[in-house]
Amino acid sequence: MQSSPSTLGPGRAADTCQAPPGPERPPVARARAVASSLGPASASGRVPRGLDMSAQETPQGRRFPIEAGDSPGLASAPESQDSPEPVATDQNPVRPLRRCPGCHCLTLLHVPIDVYLAMGGSPRARAT
């Protein structure tokens, strides 16, 4: 008896998978198993609104680049005109700001010295 190319026995070199052979499943059952592993929305054949990657709009450009220590969630959040003051929560702590003695600029508190120097800060001591 001659075996057909579709029924390869164990030990044939045509299959490159190293896993032991399992029971054959019809394509419909295989598709159902894949859909059920992806969740209920995919099993029904519909993609939930908002998750379709082709329908998403391109995000608006940020004004400033993300820097070390910035939260990715804060960087992509759109600014709203409703609340000019950001609200501190557990997920997005607000950086403390302080006015310098001349009252003309805001400074960040608790900036590590290496970050300050890397941003062009002067290594000399400040007069207080």
Swiss-Prot record:
Transmembrane segments: none
Region Disordered, annotated ranges: 1-96
UniProt-listed InterPro entries: FAM229
Family label: Belongs to the FAM229 family.
PANTHER family: PROTEIN FAM229A
Protein name: Protein FAM229A
Lineage: Eukaryota, Metazoa, Chordata, Craniata, Vertebrata
